Amino acid sequence: MDLLSCTVNDAEIFSLVKKEVLSLNTNDYTTAISLSNRLKINKKKINQQLYKLQKEDTVKMVPSNPPKWFKNYNCDNGEKHDSKLEQKNHIPNHIFSDTVPYKKIINWKDKNPCIVLNEYCQFTCRDWSIDITTSGKSHCPMFTATVIISGIKFKPAIGNTKREAKYNASKITMDEILDSVIIKF
Protein backbone atom coordinates (compact mmCIF):
# COMPACT_ATOMS: atom_id res chain seq x y z
CA MET A 1 0.00 0.00 0.00
CA ASP A 2 1.39 3.38 -0.95
CA LEU A 3 1.71 6.19 1.56
CA LEU A 4 -0.27 8.72 -0.45
CA SER A 5 -3.07 6.25 -1.16
CA CYS A 6 -4.06 6.26 2.51
CA THR A 7 -4.03 10.03 2.96
CA VAL A 8 -5.24 11.35 -0.41
CA ASN A 9 -8.90 11.24 -1.45
CA ASP A 10 -10.21 10.58 -4.98
CA ALA A 11 -10.68 14.28 -5.80
CA GLU A 12 -7.06 15.02 -4.94
CA ILE A 13 -5.83 12.01 -6.93
CA PHE A 14 -7.99 13.14 -9.85
CA SER A 15 -6.44 16.62 -9.82
CA LEU A 16 -2.91 15.19 -9.52
CA VAL A 17 -3.45 12.81 -12.45
CA LYS A 18 -5.08 15.54 -14.54
CA LYS A 19 -2.17 17.90 -13.83
CA GLU A 20 0.34 15.22 -14.87
CA VAL A 21 -1.52 14.39 -18.09
CA LEU A 22 -2.01 18.04 -19.08
CA SER A 23 1.71 18.66 -18.57
CA LEU A 24 2.56 16.09 -21.28
CA ASN A 25 4.24 17.41 -24.41
CA THR A 26 2.69 16.89 -27.84
CA ASN A 27 4.62 13.69 -28.61
CA ASP A 28 4.53 12.24 -25.10
CA TYR A 29 2.30 9.59 -23.60
CA THR A 30 2.05 8.02 -20.20
CA THR A 31 0.89 4.77 -18.66
CA ALA A 32 -0.86 4.10 -15.36
CA ILE A 33 2.29 2.35 -14.15
CA SER A 34 4.53 5.35 -14.80
CA LEU A 35 2.01 7.73 -13.18
CA SER A 36 1.76 5.39 -10.20
CA ASN A 37 5.54 5.37 -9.79
CA ARG A 38 5.81 9.14 -10.22
CA LEU A 39 2.95 10.06 -7.87
CA LYS A 40 3.50 7.15 -5.44
CA ILE A 41 -0.20 6.24 -5.64
CA ASN A 42 -1.76 2.83 -6.20
CA LYS A 43 -2.05 1.97 -9.93
CA LYS A 44 -5.69 0.91 -9.53
CA LYS A 45 -6.61 4.39 -8.28
CA ILE A 46 -4.62 6.01 -11.10
CA ASN A 47 -6.50 3.90 -13.67
CA GLN A 48 -9.86 4.95 -12.21
CA GLN A 49 -8.91 8.60 -12.59
CA LEU A 50 -7.56 8.11 -16.13
CA TYR A 51 -10.88 6.59 -17.23
CA LYS A 52 -12.74 9.53 -15.63
CA LEU A 53 -10.50 11.90 -17.61
CA GLN A 54 -11.25 9.91 -20.75
CA LYS A 55 -15.00 10.38 -20.18
CA GLU A 56 -14.34 14.13 -19.80
CA ASP A 57 -12.48 14.02 -23.15
CA THR A 58 -9.31 15.31 -21.47
CA VAL A 59 -7.23 12.27 -22.42
CA LYS A 60 -7.24 9.73 -25.22
CA MET A 61 -6.30 6.10 -24.77
CA VAL A 62 -4.81 3.72 -27.28
CA PRO A 63 -5.35 0.13 -26.23
CA SER A 64 -2.03 -1.62 -25.99
CA ASN A 65 -0.30 -3.51 -23.26
CA PRO A 66 -0.17 -1.44 -21.06
CA PRO A 67 -2.65 1.15 -22.39
CA LYS A 68 -1.02 4.38 -23.56
CA TRP A 69 -2.63 7.64 -22.44
CA PHE A 70 -2.02 10.98 -24.09
CA LYS A 71 -3.42 14.46 -23.80
CA ASN A 72 -6.38 15.34 -26.02
CA TYR A 73 -4.91 18.07 -28.21
CA ASN A 74 -8.22 19.93 -28.31
CA CYS A 75 -7.88 20.62 -24.58
CA ASP A 76 -5.12 23.13 -25.36
CA ASN A 77 -7.59 25.38 -27.15
CA GLY A 78 -10.33 24.87 -24.61
CA GLU A 79 -12.52 23.36 -27.36
CA LYS A 80 -14.27 20.05 -27.16
CA HIS A 81 -14.10 17.75 -30.15
CA ASP A 82 -17.22 15.69 -30.86
CA SER A 83 -15.71 13.23 -33.30
CA LYS A 84 -14.10 10.16 -31.77
CA LEU A 85 -11.99 9.73 -34.89
CA GLU A 86 -8.61 11.40 -35.10
CA GLN A 87 -6.50 11.78 -38.20
CA LYS A 88 -3.22 9.81 -38.11
CA ASN A 89 -1.10 12.96 -38.54
CA HIS A 90 -2.48 14.36 -35.25
CA ILE A 91 -1.43 11.29 -33.26
CA PRO A 92 2.15 10.87 -31.99
CA ASN A 93 4.18 8.30 -33.93
CA HIS A 94 4.92 6.17 -30.87
CA ILE A 95 1.25 5.20 -30.47
CA PHE A 96 1.80 2.40 -33.01
CA SER A 97 5.34 1.54 -31.91
CA ASP A 98 4.46 -1.94 -30.66
CA THR A 99 7.01 -4.72 -30.39
CA VAL A 100 6.34 -7.34 -33.08
CA PRO A 101 8.36 -10.56 -33.42
CA TYR A 102 10.56 -10.80 -36.51
CA LYS A 103 8.99 -14.15 -37.51
CA LYS A 104 5.54 -12.57 -37.61
CA ILE A 105 6.73 -9.80 -39.93
CA ILE A 106 8.39 -12.37 -42.23
CA ASN A 107 5.13 -14.39 -42.29
CA TRP A 108 3.21 -11.23 -43.26
CA LYS A 109 5.49 -10.52 -46.23
CA ASP A 110 3.48 -12.38 -48.90
CA LYS A 111 0.02 -12.08 -47.34
CA ASN A 112 -2.85 -9.84 -48.38
CA PRO A 113 -2.60 -6.49 -46.50
CA CYS A 114 -6.18 -6.92 -45.16
CA ILE A 115 -5.13 -10.19 -43.51
CA VAL A 116 -1.94 -8.60 -42.17
CA LEU A 117 -3.97 -5.69 -40.76
CA ASN A 118 -6.37 -8.11 -39.07
CA GLU A 119 -3.53 -10.16 -37.57
CA TYR A 120 -1.71 -7.02 -36.39
CA CYS A 121 -4.85 -5.72 -34.66
CA GLN A 122 -5.47 -9.10 -33.02
CA PHE A 123 -1.84 -9.26 -31.87
CA THR A 124 -1.97 -5.74 -30.38
CA CYS A 125 -5.56 -6.04 -29.02
CA ARG A 126 -6.92 -3.16 -31.10
CA ASP A 127 -10.26 -2.82 -32.81
CA TRP A 128 -10.34 -1.86 -36.48
CA SER A 129 -12.69 -1.27 -39.38
CA ILE A 130 -12.63 -0.09 -42.97
CA ASP A 131 -14.98 2.72 -43.96
CA ILE A 132 -15.94 2.63 -47.66
CA THR A 133 -17.62 5.48 -49.52
CA THR A 134 -18.80 5.56 -53.12
CA SER A 135 -18.47 8.48 -55.50
CA GLY A 136 -18.89 9.04 -59.20
CA LYS A 137 -21.61 7.92 -61.57
CA SER A 138 -23.53 4.72 -60.98
CA HIS A 139 -22.18 3.07 -64.15
CA CYS A 140 -18.52 3.74 -63.20
CA PRO A 141 -18.26 4.32 -59.43
CA MET A 142 -15.04 5.05 -57.55
CA PHE A 143 -14.63 3.68 -54.05
CA THR A 144 -12.68 5.32 -51.25
CA ALA A 145 -11.62 3.16 -48.31
CA THR A 146 -10.29 4.45 -45.00
CA VAL A 147 -8.83 2.21 -42.31
CA ILE A 148 -9.73 3.08 -38.71
CA ILE A 149 -7.71 1.50 -35.90
CA SER A 150 -8.70 2.23 -32.30
CA GLY A 151 -10.52 5.36 -33.44
CA ILE A 152 -7.57 6.68 -35.46
CA LYS A 153 -8.23 7.30 -39.15
CA PHE A 154 -5.46 6.59 -41.62
CA LYS A 155 -4.96 7.90 -45.16
CA PRO A 156 -7.76 6.96 -47.56
CA ALA A 157 -7.17 4.98 -50.76
CA ILE A 158 -9.14 4.86 -54.00
CA GLY A 159 -10.07 1.86 -56.12
CA ASN A 160 -12.34 0.88 -59.00
CA THR A 161 -13.88 -1.86 -56.83
CA LYS A 162 -14.51 -2.12 -53.11
CA ARG A 163 -11.99 -4.94 -52.91
CA GLU A 164 -9.30 -2.84 -54.62
CA ALA A 165 -10.00 0.16 -52.36
CA LYS A 166 -9.81 -2.03 -49.23
CA TYR A 167 -6.58 -3.62 -50.46
CA ASN A 168 -4.98 -0.23 -51.21
CA ALA A 169 -6.08 1.32 -47.89
CA SER A 170 -4.83 -1.70 -45.93
CA LYS A 171 -1.49 -1.60 -47.74
CA ILE A 172 -0.99 2.13 -47.05
CA THR A 173 -1.93 1.67 -43.38
CA MET A 174 0.29 -1.35 -42.81
CA ASP A 175 3.23 0.39 -44.51
CA GLU A 176 2.82 3.32 -42.08
CA ILE A 177 2.45 1.06 -39.06
CA LEU A 178 5.33 -1.26 -39.96
CA ASP A 179 7.58 1.79 -40.28
CA SER A 180 7.00 2.55 -36.60
CA VAL A 181 6.90 -0.93 -35.00
CA ILE A 182 9.80 -2.27 -33.00
CA ILE A 183 11.02 -5.59 -34.38
CA LYS A 184 11.91 -8.23 -31.79
CA PHE A 185 14.59 -10.66 -32.97
Curated annotation (Swiss-Prot):
SMART domains: DSRM. The keyword Transmembrane does not apply. Keywords: Host-virus interaction, Inhibition of host innate immune response by virus, Inhibition of host interferon signaling pathway by virus, Inhibition of host IRF3 by virus, Inhibition of host IRF7 by virus, Inhibition of host PKR by virus, Inhibition of host RLR pathway by virus, Interferon antiviral system evasion, Modulation of host cell apoptosis by virus, RNA-binding, Viral immunoevasion. Residues 112-179 form the DRBM domain. RNA-binding protein that plays a role in the inhibition of multiple cellular antiviral responses activated by double-stranded RNA (dsRNA), such as inhibition of PKR activation, necroptosis, and IFN-mediated antiviral activities. Recognizes and binds Z-RNA structures via its Z-binding domain and dsRNA via its DRBM domain: RNA-binding activity is required to escape host ZBP1-dependent necroptosis. Belongs to the poxviridae E3 protein family. The Z-binding domain recognizes and binds Z-nucleic acid structures. This is Protein E3 homolog. It comes from Yaba-like disease virus.
